[in-house]
Every structure is written in structure tokens, then in C-alpha cells.
């Protein structure tokens, strides 16, 4: 689908918006431990991979795309923020198509962060139960090609999107749902 978008719109009209909570902090931590104990970074350490823009820059370079390239790190909403921005870029006429989505890997850094927030479940995840007691972490990736019109027969429609902040709590929205309603 990326190649179809390139053929239809050209490389300068395709953007990239990708999100990630943790951009390689685990690898950076290991590399810095090696530096302080052994006096040098491991030979396979790539400082560029630690940059906040790494995932979007990587995809842009892989496909030689010349459109806007943005990365998002807004915790759990990183991928959603990327998809929303992609939609806005298309609606504004900045891009004709945008590669959007996100990727996250399991890492001790993220696990410890959620554990310090007391957000990790003590048992199997039960998100829709009134007895839920937290989340279970995983890893994954999902990438979409959003475009101003159909590229192929597998096209879907993004019917709407929104973002808001209820300024309540990092992991617990207002119980009345007003933050979600505002979005």
C-alpha cells in the first residue's frame, strides 16, 4: 500500500506520523552501563536509535519519503496521537497520504514506570470487569496508510477522532467521563 501511495501521490506528498512510549531506553541503559564499566559503548550501539524521532525518520528514509515526518511520545496515547495528526495533515492539504500508527516493545523501563504508578495488575488483565486492578503490559505495532481517497480495495474510513485532557490524573480519567466526552 505504501508503494501504491508513492505511485499515486509522489514521495513529497506522503508524510509519516508514528508513536512510541519508549524509544529504545532499554538499549541506551545497557550501552551506558557498558560505557561506565568497560570504558566504551558496545560496537552495535546506535545513538541515533535513541532519538525521539527515530521511528518516523527510519520509515521516511526506508521509503525515500520527502513529506513531513513526525514522532509522538505521549505515553499510552502515542499511536492514537500519531493517527489523529495524520488525519489532520490530510484534511489540511499538507499531505495526500500519511503512514501512521505506532510501535512499542516490552522493556524493564516501561514496566518499572507503570509499576511505580501502581498500574500493573496482580493477576490476568480484566479490562471490562468492575473488579479489574490494573493493566498487563505487552508489545506490538500497528501501521496504517491514511490517504485523501481510496488507494486500493482494502481501504477503510477513519470516521472521526479526537483528543482531550481532563487534567485529572495520569492513569485515571475523571469518573464522570467528561474528558472522553470532550474528545
Regions found by a protein language model. Give the residues of each.
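Condensing-enzyme catalytic core mediating Claisen C-C bond formation in acyl metabolism
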Residues: 124-183
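Phosphate/pyrophosphate-binding betaalpha-module
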Residues: 101-139
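Active-site-proximal gating segment of KS-fold condensing enzymes and close homologs
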Residues: 20-70
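Active-site-proximal alpha-helical scaffold in enzymes
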Residues: 3, 52, 60-63, 69-102, ...
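A glycine- and small-aliphatic-rich helix-loop capping segment at beta-alpha/alpha-beta transitions
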Residues: 29-41, 59, 89-92, 112-123
Amino acid at each position: 500500500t505504501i508503494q501504491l501511495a508513492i505511485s499515486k501521490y509522489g514521495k513529497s506528498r506522503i508524510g509519516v506520523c508514528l508513536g512510541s512510549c519508549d524509544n529504545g531506553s532499554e538499549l541506551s541503559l545497557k550501552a551506558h552501563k557498558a560505557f561506565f564499566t568497560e570504558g566504551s559503548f558496545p560496537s552495535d550501539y546506535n545513538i541515533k536509535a535513541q532519538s525521539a524521532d527515530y521511528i518516523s525518520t527510519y520509515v521516511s528514509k526506508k521509503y525515500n519519503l520527502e513529506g513531513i515526518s513526525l514522532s509522538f511520545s505521549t505515553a499510552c496515547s502515542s499511536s492514537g496521537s500519531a493517527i489523529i495528526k495524520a488525519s489532520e495533515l490530510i484534511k489540511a492539504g499538507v499531505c495526500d497520504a500519511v503512514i501512521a500508527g505506532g510501535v512499542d516493545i516490552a522493556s524493564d523501563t516501561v514496566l518499572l514506570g507503570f509499576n511505580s504508578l501502581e498500574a500493573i495488575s496482580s493477576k490476568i488483565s480484566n479490562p471490562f470487569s468492575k473488579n479489574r486492578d490494573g493493566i498487563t503490559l505487552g508489545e506490538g505495532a500497528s501501521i496504517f496508510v491514511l490517504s485523501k481517497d481510496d488507494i486500493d480495495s482494502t481501504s477503510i474510513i477513519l470516521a472521526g477522532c479526537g483528543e482531550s485532557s481532563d487534567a485529572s490524573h495520569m492513569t485515571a480519567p475523571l469518573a464522570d467521563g467528561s474528558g472522553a466526552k470532550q474528545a
